[in-house]
UniProtKB/Swiss-Prot annotation:
<dbReference type="GO" id="GO:0045202">
    <property type="term" value="C:synapse"/>
</dbReference>
<keyword id="KW-0732">Signal</keyword>
<dbReference type="GO" id="GO:0031777">
    <property type="term" value="F:type 1 melanin-concentrating hormone receptor binding"/>
</dbReference>
<keyword id="KW-0527">Neuropeptide</keyword>
<dbReference type="GO" id="GO:0007268">
    <property type="term" value="P:chemical synaptic transmission"/>
</dbReference>
<keyword id="KW-1015">Disulfide bond</keyword>
<comment type="function">
    <text>Plays a role in skin pigmentation by antagonizing the action of melanotropin alpha. Induces melanin concentration within the melanophores. May participate in the control of the hypothalamo-pituitary adrenal gland axis by inhibiting the release of ACTH.</text>
</comment>
<comment type="similarity">
    <text>Belongs to the melanin-concentrating hormone family.</text>
</comment>
<feature type="disulfide bond">
    <location>
        <begin position="120"/>
        <end position="129"/>
    </location>
</feature>
<dbReference type="InterPro" id="IPR005456">
    <property type="entry name" value="Prepro-melanin_conc_hormone"/>
</dbReference>
<protein>
    <recommendedName>
        <fullName>Pro-MCH 2</fullName>
    </recommendedName>
</protein>
<dbReference type="GO" id="GO:0007218">
    <property type="term" value="P:neuropeptide signaling pathway"/>
</dbReference>
<dbReference type="Pfam" id="PF05824">
    <property type="entry name" value="Pro-MCH"/>
</dbReference>
<keyword id="KW-0372">Hormone</keyword>
<feature type="signal peptide">
    <location>
        <begin position="1"/>
        <end position="24"/>
    </location>
</feature>
<keyword id="KW-0165">Cleavage on pair of basic residues</keyword>
<dbReference type="GO" id="GO:0030354">
    <property type="term" value="F:melanin-concentrating hormone activity"/>
</dbReference>
């Protein structure tokens, strides 16, 4: 039901867009509108020139800046700000030293056979937990 309502609204919007008032204006009236637009543009350009003459250059050149999408991906290593903060906090924790005594095992409650068969994720590979 929702899809049909959305398609009817979309079709209605397209139908109404075809009958805009500019389509019904006679050709002579359209030329007057173009003259009014040119006059408005020239007035606006004069206002800008009066406010800051250094910023207005001769001619009507436009500068379009296009950014490389790869540049945006590499910005902040491709991570959002909240993930960068979490990664920095994790790096601080990773740099701390963790000491274990030689006689200290992983857990005395886990039997040796079970400990050897347990698998832990190391990177992208499952390895026995005692190798970690």
């Amino acid at each position: 039901m929702r899809d049909s309502v959305l398609s009817v609204i979309f079709a209605l919007a397209l139908f109404l867009e075809c009958y805009t008032p500019s389509m019904a204006i006679p050709m002579g009236k359209m030329e007057d509108t173009a003259l009014e637009q040119d006059t408005l543009d020239s007035l606006l350009n004069e206002e800008v020139a009066d406010k800051n003459p250094d910023s207005v250059r001769s001619g009507s050149s436009k500068i379009i800046v296009l950014a490389d999408s790869g540049m945006w991906k590499n910005l902040n290593r491709g991570l959002p700000l909240y993930k960068l903060k979490a990664a920095a906090a994790g790096l601080d924790r990773a740099l701390t030293l963790d000491r274990r005594e030689a006689d200290q095992d992983l857990s005395p409650s886990i039997s040796i056979v079970r400990r050897d068969t347990m698998r832990c994720m190391v990177g992208r590979v499952y390895r026995p937990c005692w190798e970690v």
